[in-house]
Amino acid sequence: MGKYCASLGVLKGPWDQVFAAFWQRYPNPYSKHVLTEDIVHREVTADHKLLSRRLLTKTNRMPRWAERFFPANVAHNVYIVEDSIVDPKNRTMTTFTWNINHARLMAVEERCVYRVNPENSSWTEVKREAWVSSSLFGVSRAVQEFGLARFKSNVTKSTKGFEYVLARMQGEAPSKTLVETAKEATEKAKETALAATEKAKDLASKAATKKKQFV
C-alpha cells in the first residue's frame, strides 16, 4: 500500500495571474531540477475549457542506498507527463502528473487544484495531493518514505518558484487576460511541436497507453 499526502496553500496573486504564471514559471531559481518542458497536446473543448498535456524532464537524485537499483546504462532523469484542464468560467485549473519511467522503483502521482481563495478573492488557493508507491521488494516502505519527503520538499520549491514569477509579473505591466495568455500558449505549443524531438514523441506515445486523465 502506498503513501498519501495532501496540503493546502495560498498564492498571493489573483487566479488569472496565477494561471498565466503557471505557463511562465520555468525556468526560475527554484526549478533547477526541471531540465525540459514540451507541450505535446492542446485543445479547447466545446464548453471552452483548455486541455493540455506536457512532457517534462526532471533530475531528482535518489539516496545513495537506492542507487544500486539503477542499472549502469539507465539514465537517472525522470520523465513526467502533466495533464491540465483550465475552466475559465469557474476559474479553476486542475493538473495531474505522473512519472512514466522508473515507476517500479517509485511511482508518484500528483493532483493539484487551483481556485480563487474563498476568503480573499485577490489570492489563489492551491490544494495538492500525492500518491507515492514502490514495487521494490524489501525496501518499498523506505522508498515511499523518501518519495513523500521529496514531494514535500518539491512543494516548497514550487511555491517559491510561483512567488518568484508572480513578483516579476506584478512588477511589470498589468497581467494579460486569460484569452491572451491561452492564445500565446497555443502559438508556443505549435512552435514547440514542430521542434519536438523524436524522444519526446516516443515518450508521449508510451504515456498515452495509460488511461488519459483529462485529454
Curated annotation (Swiss-Prot):
It catalyses: a 1,2-diacyl-sn-glycero-3-phosphate(in) = a 1,2-diacyl-sn-glycero-3-phosphate(out). It is found in: Mitochondrion; Mitochondrion intermembrane space. GO terms for cellular component: mitochondrial intermembrane space; mitochondrion. It comes from the Eukaryota. Keywords: Apoptosis, Lipid transport, Mitochondrion, Transit peptide, Transport. One of its GO terms (molecular function) is phosphatidic acid transfer activity. Expressed within the blood islands and in the liver. Residues 36-174 form the PRELI/MSF1 domain. Pfam families: PRELI. Transmembrane segments: none annotated. One of its GO terms (biological process) is phospholipid transport. Its main location: mitochondrion. InterPro entries: PRELI/MSF1_dom, Slowmo/Ups. Involved in the modulation of the mitochondrial apoptotic pathway by ensuring the accumulation of cardiolipin (CL) in mitochondrial membranes. The TRIAP1:PRELID1 complex probably functions as a PA transporter across the mitochondrion intermembrane space to provide PA for CL synthesis in the inner membrane. May be involved in hematopoiesis during avian development. Forms a complex with TRIAP1 in the mitochondrion intermembrane space. This is PRELI domain-containing protein 1, mitochondrial. It comes from Gallus gallus. The gene is PRELID1.
